[in-house]
């Protein structure tokens, strides 16, 4: 059975790059009738925060990427928090030491740093070996460690050989002998390094495929060597392309919003974000672009992942969001849009009126946060607009003639035509002025939609105010 995992570190909000990785894993698991596992890699004690764990899970749920096993739902391969698995890592490190594949190091971190700087100053690569650390392994140093309650670090003996990775996306990648030296797998604070914890977890959780960003490609050499040391076949690797900003540089905060939470707060829909992220580094067999989650699952395959960097285009995401927004049932749209109106200080009293406003304005909106300003004039009088002198009589007469008319465009339009003809006013100039009087804006939805919805009382009041009444 296919078993994949998404393993974020709770050091910040869920980045769109991480969300895309989670999405590809989720789609592959669902397509192959496998399991999608959430594992929290929280061994970086200084940067990990419980608050971010909750936020990460909240963002994944919002996107609809629900996991089969994880910290909150449990499973047969837990615990799913690395901080709760420390004893497991120690046992596996000790096993490697016993088998002669790893060794204890009694050097302090600053001594190791000194060695590193010395090697660099001599123009050598900072590669470590067991012989280099032997001078620190003395009875005095061991006693010191014991008295201070410290544990020796554990270093893995890197075999001197080539390793070959057959990556689903990158193809054959050869790691040459001597690319790296021995490396630390357990620190002196008793915590595992990323690569070691990752391999132990993937091994014990029976992960079959590792789908992750290609910034992890450099970690793969160490991981392949560790799988070999544990006499386990590595999973299938698929390193997906980097996401770049429109300027061709790695996507970062300088490009604007980059976290799922930020896009949600701006009024993007999960359907749109999922659809858009799926197309960053993957393509539909028939070139389709607008795809539901179900359609993405049924058409997803690893062989359509591209090795080329993907460009994050905010305008395309916005266009896609507009499509989903306009095609959403009005009840759902009203429910999602309401908080944005409240935040903008607009109180919704009449639900049916609110839905009609959304129907009229949604063609001009691409994200939920644009609704309040696009439709504020339906809820509040705009600042009075001065009517040009030559049109004051037109508006005064209209105000009188429309008092007793039934409020439908079928009844209102003939009155407009009659009054304009009497005064010889061009319709274009009149309607532009009328729009400004009613909405305070130069453009917006069609007046034939605005006028009936505003109602007679508001229509006449706004004309009265602009006439200086």
Swiss-Prot record:
Superkingdom, natural source: Bacteria
Enzymatic reactions: tRNA(Glu) + L-glutamate + ATP = L-glutamyl-tRNA(Glu) + AMP + diphosphate
Binding positions (ATP): 253
GO biological process, alphabetically ordered: glutamyl-tRNA aminoacylation
InterPro entries assigned: aa-tRNA-synth_I_cd-bd (IPR045462), aa-tRNA-synth_I_codon-bd_sub2 (IPR020751), aa-tRNA-synth_I_CS (IPR001412), aa_tRNA-synth_I_cd-bd_sf (IPR008925), Glu-tRNA-ligase_bac/mito (IPR004527), Glu-tRNA-synth_I_codon-bd_sub1 (IPR020752), Glu/Gln-tRNA-synth (IPR000924), Glu/Gln-tRNA-synth_Ib_cat-dom (IPR020058)
EC number, as in UniProt: 6.1.1.17
GO cellular component: cytosol
Top-rank EC class of the record's enzyme: ligase
Any one Pfam family match given in the protein's UniProt record, by short name: Anticodon_2
GO molecular function: ATP binding; glutamate-tRNA ligase activity; tRNA binding; zinc ion binding
Broad class of where this protein is predominantly found: cytoplasm
Motif position, 'KMSKS' region: 250-254
Function: Catalyzes the attachment of glutamate to tRNA(Glu) in a two-step reaction: glutamate is first activated by ATP to form Glu-AMP and then transferred to the acceptor end of tRNA(Glu).
Family indicated by similarity: Belongs to the class-I aminoacyl-tRNA synthetase family. Glutamate--tRNA ligase type 1 subfamily.
Subunit and interaction comment: Monomer.
Protein name: Glutamate--tRNA ligase 2
